């Protein structure tokens, strides 16, 4: 009983367990095998289209997973496996597409499918179902033995994609080679008559396509090929925006990106479609970058747009959503007017496009003149106005206005512009004036300078400048000058009196306030110290010591250093408590010296020079070397001079000069330094410290030696330019000493010649007169002073013993004397009369003349000439030229007189040319007896003739000589 009780439950459990196991086996779904109904392909797209169904489907809908396997060439060469999930409906075909990477025309493909249930409505399936049978995809074409084919034809693809080109050629064609444009490409052999060319990451070369050309090296050599149309990659639209200007339309715009159009109609420009999700409206744009969307009145405020770009290869989309009231872009203001109020004000009015009284716009007003802009904001419903104030007279202005939504700012409207001009008014500012004064011929030349007024100060076109010059000593008298614009300076010539100068400027509406300047007596003659300053890059730091506390301010003026007193003067006005300033100017240049003057201006408007300063913003090395001359040289030295070198007009302050000397010996004595040039040549250098020393004596040299020298100045920036050396040779020592002797002697001789030439007349009269005069002969006086006075001719001490006087009796024949002969009547028949002892106590010294140029017969009215001849006989042979009877007549008539009784006796001596022809009164005689040239007598030294020689015999053949024998006692 008990056992049965225990056994019965155990049996029941076993039966239940067996039932449960059997029910599980029975409830697991049977595997479903798909059945392929249709396999098609699209060769242009290289696409395989597959359709299949699932028989014995127990549910209306069932989620299933299909595994698709594709093989190429044969079923064992699997190239593609893909799982495809979809919902399968009873008695409805499932479709699937596959794109081949190899043209379908080149090779066969095989496809099969198996399924797996993946749905909660059915018990899960633990494994894949059975495979369907294989389906062949055969689009392969046949090729003739001598031909070749290439696929795909005119392929369209995107830049950066990959493509495989298939070559098919007949059995008679071998070794086919291909080129992409001009670049060769290599392929792989698929079978004996099919080759594949794989191109990766193709690039865009042209919208007309990229050519691929092929040719066989064996068999028919016909060229064949295809064209790849590579398109730019389609981009999604950028910066998509929509706005309204009148709440009637929405203007949507975007940036389309690159153009993907291809030629030959392979691909047109991408299309753009605008779809709004709330209204379910879609519109295709006729433009590539914009579309105008019509707003339905009162329809909606919120918009959600999708903009889609599409071409043959792909689609790109972008979304935008907004509130209409937040995208308001107002139209430009209209009816803008301007009213000029005086010279400094203008009122502008305008209107806006109405959006209702509850809609407020914010308008921006802009005033522009030149580069200056002023902006103001105004709230507007329908119309508004704005008053411009503080305008400049005689100025052209541009007024602008634009508006935007005041509640939700989106964009400003376009500007509306209006131009206007303000009228002129009198200048409002006095001129900034200054002066430059210098002396010339006892007067002052004053150059007045003034700076032009700013446009805001001139208040119109400046016409002229009026200058009034008032002499403080004569205040009622003044001079007026007018200088026409645009001149900014003028010159005045004033005396040394103090003056007041008043300057104003005028435009068409009046004159400016006057500027006053006072010139004191010493203006232009101030002597102050000058110091050197160093500038910085484009500026100078100027400082000075205040002179007095009673000052109205300071003026610093400056200009570039030049030899001309007139320069482009600049100045700067400073306050009374200022003792330093920085002067900057774009005109400052390196290597140019600038002179600064600091003036103190008193309350009386007088300017007093306080200090002078000079400097460079940057010193440069000298640009020019001095021209050196050698004024003097010796065997052991020579002198170098460069006096004409102006050190004040160089590119820097001249600190000194460097003198280089080189020779063969190259021995440098102190203070010379031995130095090297860049070309490694050795020379001696001497540093002349200071710019004023412009002379140097080079000493300790060798005679007759060649030296080379070179002189260059230097500044803080360095020495001057390198130039060629000048050669000099020292002279010989002996020739130099000889020159020292000869030169003074030559100078003395030249001086003597000059003095003699200067006193030539005096020397001639004293030493060798043209007409010797014994009474004026200084030689005689010299002899007289040194010798016995009895040996010197003294007329008053000589008494003539015998005189020959030739008289010309009227009616008688003129006596003529030939050369060396006498006429018959003149030949003495008696011996000449000779003084005897009875007449004289002893020998009487007499003067003997051999010069026949003087004749004492001047006292006779019948004057005549004597024919001189050479004196061949000695003194003791000479006789009287006159016969005794004539001599007695002379004595009787008192023809002989003391020579010293009358001064006229000196002048009564008749000069007869020593070369004169015979003087004859008979023409016949002249004809028959031509004159014979005679030797010219000369004035010879007088001598004392002894008494024993007083009466020599006269021979006929002797030449005639005029002889005078004077007795000692004759007065």
Curated annotation (Swiss-Prot):
- Find motif (WSXWS motif) and give its ranges: 412-416
Q: What induces it?
A: Up-regulated by IL31 in dorsal root ganglia.
Q: In which tissues is it expressed?
A: Widely expressed. Expressed at highest levels in the lung, heart, thymus and spleen. Expressed in dorsal root ganglia.
Glycosylated residues are 74, 97, 130, 162, 239, 271, 304, 323, 377, 491, 541, 577, 689, 722
Report the residue ranges where the short sequence motif Box 1 motif is annotated in this entry: 767-775
Q: For this UniProt entry, which residues form the secretion signal? A: 1-23
> From what superkingdom does this record's organism come?
Eukaryota
Membrane side Extracellular: residue ranges: 24-737
Q: Which PROSITE patterns match?
A: FN3 (PS50853), HEMATOPO_REC_L_F2 (PS01353)
Record GO cellular component, one term: external side of plasma membrane
Location of the protein in the cell:
Membrane
Q: How does it assemble?
A: Heterodimer composed of OSMR and IL6ST (type II OSM receptor). Heterodimer with IL31RA to form the IL31 receptor.
- This protein's domain notes: The WSXWS motif appears to be necessary for proper protein folding and thereby efficient intracellular transport and cell-surface receptor binding.
Question: Would you tell me the protein name for this molecule?
Answer: Oncostatin-M-specific receptor subunit beta
For this protein's source organism, the top of the classification is:
Eukaryota, Metazoa, Chordata, Craniata, Vertebrata
Q: Which gene encodes it?
A: Osmr
